């Protein structure tokens, strides 16, 4: 029994060593630790960049980047370079790395600014950054992130959409339509569906497909179903527009017009006809009543396919081939 315990202890020790080495390999070497040297490096900058500076420079110490109790926290030079020329001549020489707006003539190149952040932020959500649509469109980290502010707006659910809408103006307009996701209410945000740092799916979606992303919340629509509706299986956006619509619930067009994009001709009733509705067209001794007749209940105008076909996402009822139950 004693030998067994020794082997178990040895196995646990080896496991810890392997796990520790793997974890270390996943992380880049941390920047300067919270030492007097690190504080001295910061002091070279904060001597001038103090509370009187127009930008909120010192507030970085209220963020994880400025937490001197964390050995991973960078110094000013970790991000802006040693900038010895700038220290010697602040007015005449700009820092080695300048994170500024596009109108700043001294701003560093997109690649230099991005690579500076990626020195530490390499894994996790950033692993698909290279080749992503934001990367290829020369979007840099500081276009979205406010590193020196205590509360980065893009990381808060309530304020994140405003950061995204600075560029995505069409989507800003769409969320003000009648039927929308609860973005304005602060109950969800852009990154619930999109990963702005890159993705294996289309449109920077957090999952590999549109449907898998939608099923994250709408699990009841996932299936599998005994009777499947092919456009639903193919892509939710065949019928829905995710950012907002004036046809509820987030439909691309009103029913029955939406349905008739596929179900036209002999496959379903026309909007001005009662053909193929239960009971068919009303008839008199002289034949079929025309449009505007005294029997409007057999016409499809102002009626919805969903009145009868209530299970359009799929049905598990043995008699649900027409999605009526």
List where the protein language model places each region.
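Positively charged n-region of N-terminal signal peptides that target proteins for export
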Residues: 1-6
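Short sequence/structural segments immediately N-terminal
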Residues: 20-325
């Amino acid at each position: 029994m004693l030998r067994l315990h020794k082997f178990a202890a040895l196995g646990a020790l080896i496991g810890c060593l392997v796990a520790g080495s793997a974890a270390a390999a996943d992380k880049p070497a941390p920047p300067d630790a919270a030492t007097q040297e690190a504080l001295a490096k910061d002091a070279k900058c904060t001597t001038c960049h103090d509370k009187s500076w127009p930008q909120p420079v010192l507030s970085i110490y209220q963020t994880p980047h400025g937490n001197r109790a964390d050995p991973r926290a960078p110094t000013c030079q970790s991000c802006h370079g040693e900038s010895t020329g700038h220290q010697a001549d602040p007015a005449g020489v700009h820092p080695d790395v300048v994170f500024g707006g596009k109108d700043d003539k001294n701003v560093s190149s997109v690649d230099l600014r991005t690579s500076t952040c990626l020195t530490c932020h390499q894994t996790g959500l950033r692993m698909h950054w290279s080749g992503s649509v934001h990367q290829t469109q020369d979007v840099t980290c500081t276009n979205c992130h406010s590193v020196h502010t205590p509360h980065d707006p893009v990381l808060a659910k309530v304020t994140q959409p405003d950061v995204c809408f600075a560029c995505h103006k069409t989507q800003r307009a769409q969320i003000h339509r009648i039927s929308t996701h609860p973005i304005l209410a602060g109950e969800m945000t852009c990154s619930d569906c999109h990963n702005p740092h890159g993705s294996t799916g289309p449109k920077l979606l957090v999952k590999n497909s549109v449907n898998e992303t939608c099923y994250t919340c709408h699990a009841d629509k996932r299936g599998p179903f005994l009777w499947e509706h092919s456009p639903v299986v193919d892509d939710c956006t065949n019928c829905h527009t995710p950012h907002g619509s004036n046809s509820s619930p987030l439909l691309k067009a009103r029913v029955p017009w939406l349905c008739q994009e596929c179900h036209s001709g002999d496959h379903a009733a026309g909007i001005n006809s009662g053909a193929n509705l239960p009971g068919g067209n009303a008839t008199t001794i002289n034949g079929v009543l025309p449009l505007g007749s005294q029997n409007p209940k057999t016409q499809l105008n102002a009626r919805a396919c969903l009145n009868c076909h209530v299970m359009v996402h799929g049905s598990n009822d043995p008699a649900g081939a027409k999605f009526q139950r």
